[in-house]
């Protein structure tokens, strides 16, 4: 796992400070499955949601978003959140799912709320920023924003499920994307089959 300032006997274990940001793109299940597979007993997990994300969650997830015990939610205007300053940045920030509007604001350094401020902090402190865009088709503006972000070192993992896994449910399809997100965070997982992987 990657090194961080909270390493305990590396490389055996590395506790990470992870911020999960949820925006208003359709695909709230991606965020739920990511949270389901991050262990707050092993990592420090924070969550922030945009206003539109709360509406989408209400429509797409019966019963709402479920936070595992130990996950720390923050309001969108909570500028005193522990990840809102370069003196205390997260090790990893994941925006899942990520709207094109959020992507554009991050690409151009806008920080009108704590979600966007956190992304700005992660970029300037050279920590890991992962965006999971869910939009189709893409405009030239979207692609140019993606180019800016890639040049800045951002990891883009489009919410495109793989079908070679033989998934039989929506959750299993979603997990093929979430598995890749976990890989890039640095969290070992077996939630989805790997290409050409021998079955146990």
What positions do the PLM features span?
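A cross-family phosphate/adenosyl-ligand binding-site feature
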Residues: 12-200
């Amino acid at each position: 796992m990657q090194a961080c300032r909270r390493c305990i006997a590396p490389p055996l274990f590395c506790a990470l400070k992870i911020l999960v940001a949820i925006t208003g793109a359709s695909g709230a299940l991606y965020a739920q499955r990511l949270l389901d597979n991050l262990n707050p007993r092993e990592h420090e997990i924070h969550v922030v949601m945009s206003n539109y994300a709360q509406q989408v969650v209400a429509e797409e997830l019966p019963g709402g978003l479920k936070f595992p015990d130990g996950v720390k939610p923050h309001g969108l205007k909570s500028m005193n959140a522990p990840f809102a300053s370069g003196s205390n940045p997260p090790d990893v920030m994941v925006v899942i799912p990520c709207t094109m509007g959020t992507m554009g604001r991050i690409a151009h350094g806008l920080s009108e709320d704590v979600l966007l401020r956190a992304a700005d902090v992660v970029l300037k402190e050279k920590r890991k920023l992962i965006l999971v865009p869910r939009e189709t088709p893409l405009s030239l503006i979207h692609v140019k924003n993606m180019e800016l972000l890639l040049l800045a070192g951002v990891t883009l993992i489009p919410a495109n499920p793989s079908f070679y896994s033989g998934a039989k449910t929506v959750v299993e399809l979603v997990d093929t994307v979430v598995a890749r997100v976990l890989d890039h965070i640095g969290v070992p997982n077996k939630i989805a089959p790997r290409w050409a992987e021998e079955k146990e």
